[in-house]
Design a protein with these regions (language model features):
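N-terminal export signals
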Residues: 1-17
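Acidic (Asp/Glu)-rich catalytic clusters
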Residues: 21-26, 46-51, 64-80, 104-114, ...
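Boundary/entry segment of secreted carbohydrate-active catalytic domains
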Residues: 21-42
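Hydrophobic faces of well-ordered beta-strands that scaffold small-molecule active sites
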Residues: 28-34, 57-59, 75-80, 117-119, ...
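Active-site-proximal loop/turn and secondary-structure-junction residues that shape catalytic pockets
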Residues: 36-38, 61-63, 81-83, 123-125, ...
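Short, acidic/polar
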Residues: 38-48, 61-64, 95-107, 199-200
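Mid-chain, structured segments of secreted extracytoplasmic proteins
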Residues: 73-101
Length: 200
């Protein structure tokens, strides 16, 4: 049986100063999501991250990575393939395009020294959850050999379907765990977002 991996979204934690030295301990690694700050020019944003001691950024693609490397900011959760949140792996009609996109981006993620690559189930659009799970597994299994070869971990994000992402299929941990078990690869995991899951 596959080991089910749950990866928490970037945590928001207070980094305390050492009482003796006044220096940061450096044992908490902060990450930020780029889309939240998209109005700030990238280079200005990266400079600010350096000043704040933040070491990583989520949801960035190949066009961002060279500048991120210049400032020593790690791409903790990559994107660069797919059709967005609503159109995902649960729709077999999209598999050909999704597979093509992911097979192109997986080597780029690895060559750039990164590990994690996000994916989405897509919306239900009237589809039964069991059917959607099988569809996701059938499609994702076709990219897993390349992900395994390159050491890239494909991660499907759990999102709430009550407030922010109405009709999204991967909206419960149980469904996501079942998908991990069906795929059966250590290189497929869940991106467990505590904001979204506490709503469900």
């Amino acid at each position: 049986a596959a080991t089910v991996g749950l990866v928490s979204a970037a945590g928001v934690a207070m980094e305390r100063k050492s009482a003796n030295t006044g220096n940061l301990k450096g044992n908490i690694n902060h990450s930020v999501c780029r889309w939240c700050y998209s109005k700030i020019p990238m280079e200005d944003f990266l400079q600010s991250l350096n000043e704040l001691g933040i070491t990583a950024m989520d949801l960035t693609g190949p066009e961002d990575w060279p500048l991120m490397k210049k400032y020593g900011i790690h791409a903790s959760m990559c994107w660069g393939a797919g059709l967005g949140i609503e159109k995902g792996w649960n729709d077999p009609k999209l598999h050909e395009e999704l597979i093509k996109d992911y097979l192109q981006i997986i080597p780029k993620v690895a060559e750039s020294g990164y590990t994690n690559l996000i994916c989405f189930s897509g919306n239900r659009n009237g589809m039964n959850d069991d059917v959607g799970l099988k569809n996701c597994a059938d499609g994702l299994k076709q990219i897993m050999p390349l992900a395994e070869k390159h050491g890239v971990v494909i991660q499907m994000e759990l999102l709430n379907s009550k407030v922010d992402h109405k009709d999204y299929m991967c909206d419960h941990a149980e469904w996501g765990v079942a998908l991990c078990q069906e795929i059966g690869s250590e290189n497929f995991k869940l991106l467990y977002d505590i904001y979204h899951m506490q709503i469900m």
